[in-house]
Amino acid sequence: MKYTSYFLALLLCVLLGFSGSYGQGQFFREIENLKEYFNASNPDVAKGGPLFSEILKNWKDESDKKIIQSQIVSFYFKLFENLKDNQIIQRSMDIIKQDMFQKFLNGSSEKLEDFKKLIQIPVDDLQTQRKAINELIKVMNDLSPKSNLRKRKRSQNLFRGRRAST
């Protein structure tokens, strides 16, 4: 747990960006509170390397980066959920969650609810597994780039048109 907490401050800064606003100062103070609570500045936390920083470096394209960031944000929401009964750090976690919510989900409460639903889905439940497999084709179709499909259809129509005119 200590190892994970060390990177909370570092990665939230990288993940969420920097800003000079008043609220951002409070955000950094709350991260410092969490670092202190988890003793995350202790040198032993660095053993084994960072959790997310090295992975984030590998994702350069902005749209690709969003994919990995969603997994990292999911991790932090799970971490905060596991610590929700800890009154000592509750305020800090609430402020950080709110900032994360604003930056990652653009303040959309509907997106937040959907995101929470997704991270709560138990992968070891047989009924859930069956439903997931049943929806797999639709999910894969949604993942396919629609613009390529349109381009392909357009080029097929052009090719057919040329063929008919010759």
From Swiss-Prot:
Released primarily from activated T lymphocytes. GO terms for molecular function: cytokine activity; type II interferon receptor binding. The modification Pyrrolidone carboxylic acid is found at residue 24. It is found in: Secreted. InterPro entries: 4_helix_cytokine-like_core, Interferon_gamma. SUPFAM superfamilies: 4-helical cytokines. Residues 1-23 form the signal peptide. It comes from the Eukaryota. The keyword Ion transport does not apply. Its main location: secreted. GO terms for biological process: adaptive immune response; defense response to virus; humoral immune response; positive regulation of biosynthetic process. Keywords: Antiviral defense, Cytokine, Glycoprotein, Growth regulation, Pyrrolidone carboxylic acid, Secreted, Signal. Glycans are attached at residues 39, 106. One of its GO terms (cellular component) is extracellular space. PANTHER family: INTERFERON GAMMA. Type II interferon produced by immune cells such as T-cells and NK cells that plays crucial roles in antimicrobial, antiviral, and antitumor responses by activating effector immune cells and enhancing antigen presentation. Primarily signals through the JAK-STAT pathway after interaction with its receptor IFNGR1 to affect gene regulation. Upon IFNG binding, IFNGR1 intracellular domain opens out to allow association of downstream signaling components JAK2, JAK1 and STAT1, leading to STAT1 activation, nuclear translocation and transcription of IFNG-regulated genes. Belongs to the type II (or gamma) interferon family. Homodimer. Interacts with IFNGR1 (via extracellular domain); this interaction promotes IFNGR1 dimerization. This is Interferon gamma. The gene is IFNG.
